[in-house]
Each structure stands twice: as C-alpha cells, then as structure tokens.
Amino acid sequence: MATHAALASTRIPTNTRFPSKTSHSFPSQCASKRLEVGEFSGLKSTSCISYVHSARDSSFYDVVAAQLTSKANGSTAVKGVTVAKLKVAINGFGRIGRNFLRCWHGRKDSPLEVIVVNDSGGVKNASHLLKYDSMLGTFKAEVKILNNETITVDGKPIKVVSSRDPLKLPWAELGIDIVIEGTGVFVDGPGAGKHIQAGAKKVIITAPAKGADIPTYVIGVNEQDYGHEVADIISNASCTTNCLAPFAKVLDEEFGIVKGTMTTTHSYTGDQRLLDASHRDLRRARAAALNIVPTSTGAAKAVSLVLPQLKGKLNGIALRVPTPNVSVVDLVVNVAKKGISAEDVNAAFRKAAEGPLKGILDVCDVPLVSVDFRCSDVSTTIDSSLTMVMGDDMVKVVAWYDNEWGYSQRVVDLAHLVANKWPGTPKVGSGDPLEDFCETNPADEECKVYE
C-alpha cells in the first residue's frame, strides 16, 4: 500500500507552502477583514473555512488535497461548506444594533442570517438610519423598504417589528435561534429571559449583564470557556471591558498585575442628555456636547468576570467627553516583576498581537488621535509611544478602541462562536488544514509535526 508520503507527492504540488500554526491565530470561530489567511486557502479575509464532521474518516492528505485543488489548478477561491444558517433577531436597532448588522453583512460566509429587527421607529426609521449614518457614512449595501413591515438589504428581506415587551415578539413564529439584545434594558436574567419565553433559543446581551447567573465572554480572553450547554443567556461585556481585558491579560501573564486603576476617556453616548435635563446620574444630566462628564464604569471590575485572577485588583472611572465615537483607556498598574522597561511591555504586546491576540489587539507606533481609530476592527490598540514604566514596578498603558464598530465586531464574533458550538453544526475550521485535521485525529502520525 502506498505510504502517506507517496500519496502526498501525487496530490499536493511541491511548491505549495503550508502556513505555520501561528500564521493566523485569530480565534477559530470567526474571521475579521484584517485576518491574514494562508496562501493556499484562496479565501477572502472575511471568510471562515468549514470542515465537516464526515471528513474525520479521511486521511490528512485527502483533507488538504480537497482544500488545495482549486487553488493549485488556478481556479476560483475555495468555498466553505454550505450549512443551514441560524436565524438571528436584533432587539433594539440603535447604535450597536445597526453597527452589528453592518458588521454581520460584511462577513460573507457568516453562519448567521439576520431575519428580523425590533425597532420602535418602524420600517421608515430602520431603513433610513441603517442607510445613512453620521459616524459610518452611507451604507454601501442597497437598503429598501419592501412593505410596511419589511426592509431589504442587498435584496435580503429583514422583517421589522415594533414592541417594547419581549414577551410579545414573534420569536417562536419566526424560529429565532439567537437574539442580539441591544436595548441596554433587558440585561438581567428575568429581562433577557423574556426572549427565551417568547421562543428564542439563545440571547447575547450587548452590555454588562446584571446577575451572577449570566456568564460573560470577551473574545480573545475567555471565549474558550463557552459551550452550548453552559447558558442560554450570555453577555459580551462592555466596549471598555473588551478593550481592557485583552491587554490586561497580557500584562498579568507577562509581568503579574498586583493592583491598578483605569480611566476611560469615553465618547458620549445616548444615555447622556443633549441639553441639561433630568437623569438619575446628576452628572450625566448635564449637556453631553458641552462638558467633560465624570461618571462611573464597571469595566475594570468586570475584567474579573473573564480573568478571575484579577478579582479585587482593578477599579476605575469614566470621563465622558464631547466626541461622538472612539474612546481611550488609561491603565496604571503595579506589577510583580521588577526591573522592566517600556520596551519590555510593548514587546509583550507586539508578541500577543502577532500571536494569540491577532485580530483582537494591535500596537500603534504612529502618533494618532481619536478620529484615526474610527471603524477599527480590533478590540484594543496599544499606543506604544505612551507606554511608561515608573520606578521598578509601576506600568502605564494607553489603548484606543472604537466603542461602537470594534465592539460590534466582537458581538458578531461571539454570535459566530455560539453558532459554531450549536449541536449538529459543522465546525468552522481554523484556516489551517493540518490544525483542523489533528484536532479530530490527534493520534495520526502526521500530527506529530506539532510535538
């Protein structure tokens, strides 16, 4: 019988280069437009390679040959396996809801299908505000009103419903699998649970959850802990926690965080007042576009929800400022490791940005300002020139984030993770055929290359 090596010589062109295991280490359940995939794949950077369970019985070279044939022959790009898509509803078509839809629309091989939005403004508002956005500009997709309860996005129909009571939403009738809860109102178990009662199977809260019964996930930090049976309601944390947690993880792993404080200089949001008016927070009651507004944030404490070892070690505040988008975190920590330099700290971030946090964390060496980070896909961008070390154990790190677009990209990623873990759904591949093959065939001889 021919050996694997002999088979390989007949199936795989000798000039084909396999990507290294770290060449695209962005979390396997998703892909962003900044993700660089291996030369062999022939996939667009927004794609995910699907690897069906039935391929487990094939040899490694059968799997690779199937991935390579089109590319080697100079034909069209390799396509992922077509599977039934999960039906998604967006509850609350505000800043995050509309950003989420745009981000999802950009993922051409998404396992999701947005089929309905709940917007109190109806089809006219939903279509107009999706198409025309003061921050994002005009949506390149074709957005039309089909009838008094449906809009279309590039020809795809999306139903528009209007109800402030989740119990009255037609999730059962429409067969909704996942609800993106974007109102900021239904953030606890009883509130978000109304979507489950209405017929949805899973709920992703796009805000910090209230209650210890709702697990929180930050992509790049603890998404590996998610499983389909863990919970029906989960939280994507806040935009600030998504910025802070990845680089706090790097700092803690490399240098050991002892304690620290964080300040986020945060763009104003819809929770503030345009002009002075009543608000439960007397500072947020003041005109958002005219003031620097100190206020509370649970982002630093919430880091412990995804990095339990940091519980009680971090706290912080927010300064809301008169900018409409993009925010910046300033973290100061004492670390256990002594005698480090700013270069050491930045080197740790660069290593993470090219490795386990690729697509999540970036490092910027150019002296930029907030507007330059609009529509940044990553969760956090370290401003390397602002990294400081005082004495032998105090570290200051400054990181930028698009609190709307970047955060919404992570909501899409988390929804993709939920889809990837859905029972009976073919698993989305990492993009590396060898890695995918060895995950399901660890005893195979070819997998010893990883030892």
Swiss-Prot record:
Q: Name one GO biological process term.
A: reductive pentose-phosphate cycle
Asked if Calcium is a keyword of the record, the answer is: no
Q: Which protein, by its recorded name, is this?
A: Glyceraldehyde-3-phosphate dehydrogenase B, chloroplastic
* Reaction catalysis annotation: D-glyceraldehyde 3-phosphate + phosphate + NADP(+) = (2R)-3-phospho-glyceroyl phosphate + NADPH + H(+)
Marked site (Activates thiol group during catalysis) residue numbers? 266
Q: Which gene encodes it?
A: GAPB
Tell me which Gene3D superfamilies the record gives.
Answer: Dihydrodipicolinate Reductase, domain 2, NAD(P)-binding Rossmann-like Domain
UniProt-listed PANTHER family: GLYCERALDEHYDE-3-PHOSPHATE DEHYDROGENASE 2
What's a Gene Ontology MF term here? NADP binding
Q: Which SMART domains match?
A: Gp_dh_N
Residues the record lists as binding NADP(+): 95-96, 119, 164, 403
Summarize subunit and interaction data from the UniProt record for this chain: Tetramer of either four A chains (GAPDH 2) or two A and two B chains (GAPDH 1).
Q: Which Pfam families match?
A: Gp_dh_C, Gp_dh_N
The places in or outside the cell where this protein is found are: Plastid, Chloroplast
Species name for this entry?
A: Pisum sativum
An example of a Gene Ontology cellular component annotation for this protein is: chloroplast
Region of interest (Disordered), ranges: 1-25
Q: What is its EC number?
A: 1.2.1.13
Q: Which UniProt keywords apply?
A: Calvin cycle, Chloroplast, NADP, Oxidoreductase, Plastid, Transit peptide
Q: Where is the transit peptide?
A: 1-84
